[in-house]
């Protein structure tokens, strides 16, 4: 009975060994992942610089600076008058 059960097990084990290693199925390649990450970083950097340059060229910073200067000047004058 033991021989009768061990022969099929031996056949299955031999077939698995002779079959060889299983093909790689979608194992991520580290270099391609790093390349994608680098590309994402470069894209993000370009977009960030574009936004910064757009803000620098807009009128908003100048208007904000002028508003703060004017408000600060008015507060300063009020404090001088009240003192």
Curated annotation (Swiss-Prot):
<dbReference type="GO" id="GO:0006641">
    <property type="term" value="P:triglyceride metabolic process"/>
</dbReference>
<feature type="signal peptide">
    <location>
        <begin position="1"/>
        <end position="26"/>
    </location>
</feature>
<protein>
    <recommendedName>
        <fullName>Apolipoprotein C-I, basic form</fullName>
    </recommendedName>
</protein>
<dbReference type="GO" id="GO:0010916">
    <property type="term" value="P:negative regulation of very-low-density lipoprotein particle clearance"/>
</dbReference>
<comment type="similarity">
    <text>Belongs to the apolipoprotein C1 family.</text>
</comment>
<dbReference type="GO" id="GO:0006869">
    <property type="term" value="P:lipid transport"/>
</dbReference>
<dbReference type="GO" id="GO:0042157">
    <property type="term" value="P:lipoprotein metabolic process"/>
</dbReference>
<dbReference type="Pfam" id="PF04691">
    <property type="entry name" value="ApoC-I"/>
</dbReference>
<dbReference type="InterPro" id="IPR043081">
    <property type="entry name" value="ApoC-1_sf"/>
</dbReference>
<dbReference type="GO" id="GO:0004859">
    <property type="term" value="F:phospholipase inhibitor activity"/>
</dbReference>
<dbReference type="GO" id="GO:0032375">
    <property type="term" value="P:negative regulation of cholesterol transport"/>
</dbReference>
<keyword id="KW-0964">Secreted</keyword>
<dbReference type="GO" id="GO:0034361">
    <property type="term" value="C:very-low-density lipoprotein particle"/>
</dbReference>
<dbReference type="GO" id="GO:0005504">
    <property type="term" value="F:fatty acid binding"/>
</dbReference>
<comment type="function">
    <text>Inhibitor of lipoprotein binding to the low density lipoprotein (LDL) receptor, LDL receptor-related protein, and very low density lipoprotein (VLDL) receptor. Associates with high density lipoproteins (HDL) and the triacylglycerol-rich lipoproteins in the plasma and makes up about 10% of the protein of the VLDL and 2% of that of HDL. Appears to interfere directly with fatty acid uptake and is also the major plasma inhibitor of cholesteryl ester transfer protein (CETP). Binds free fatty acids and reduces their intracellular esterification.</text>
</comment>
<keyword id="KW-0445">Lipid transport</keyword>
<keyword id="KW-0732">Signal</keyword>
<keyword id="KW-0813">Transport</keyword>
<dbReference type="GO" id="GO:0034447">
    <property type="term" value="P:very-low-density lipoprotein particle clearance"/>
</dbReference>
<dbReference type="GO" id="GO:0050995">
    <property type="term" value="P:negative regulation of lipid catabolic process"/>
</dbReference>
<dbReference type="GO" id="GO:0034364">
    <property type="term" value="C:high-density lipoprotein particle"/>
</dbReference>
<dbReference type="InterPro" id="IPR006781">
    <property type="entry name" value="ApoC-I"/>
</dbReference>
